Amino acid sequence: MAIFYLAVQSVRRGEGRSAVAAAAYRAGEKLDDERTGETFNYTRRRGVVASEVIGWQGDRSSLWNAAEAAENRKNSVVAREIVIALPCELDDVRRAELVKSFAHWLHSRHGVAIDYAIHSPDKDGDQRNHHAHLMVTTRKIEGGRMGAKTRELDQKQHSRKHIEAWRSEWAAICNRALALGGTDTALDHRSYLRQAEPFGAVPLEPQKHLGPSETRLNRKGRMTAKAKQNAWARAVNKGLHQTGRLFGRGLVRGMNAMIDAAGKENLRER
């Protein structure tokens, strides 16, 4: 079943990261970083289903080298990255259309360039884990060049409302596609807490996102702390659903035994 997942992170020079290196890895390409003289070759990387640059007249190399050249500070944020889960109910072509549509929407809203790469599930991981990485410039593209900074995304008090809009738009794009495909699933970008508030109900327990390495460990029976927390959340949510209504955290009591049972199951984490 499709799930909603959208996370945003920054590519910071002060952490030793490079936008060129990140782009090369995401797209599975070989790129030269003109600022450092390094070459990043990920052409042997597997699992890249599709990739494209939106809102920039040049190629991937020229985009991210221009982004790096535009920043002079040692601790500059040279790119933003949005990671999204893609509906497993759709095929590769339809998933690519969704990501491209979202990238164009971001470009129109903020005037930035977007470089996206769609990845297939890891061979040893959850086979529903289709996802995409969208690298976003921290500057607007003006006259085919790096222009003004996207200040609306730099200030925390303002960036939150924009990220909320991103989440809402991505959910809407997915839901339209799922409905056209005849799927009953509908994604909700809101947190469980916000979903429950209008009804005065107790929200479902949220689960933590697990990366590929943690997923592999859990499949081998070595549960990480986040996996244990997810098992607890699933046990709680199962109890809440079985009541037919969400009416109190008292249901949590007595569920510890269910956690052990959940840990013995083949965890299917994203």
Range-by-range predicted roles:
Residues 1-270:
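N-terminal nicking endonuclease/strand-transfer module with a His-rich metal-binding environment
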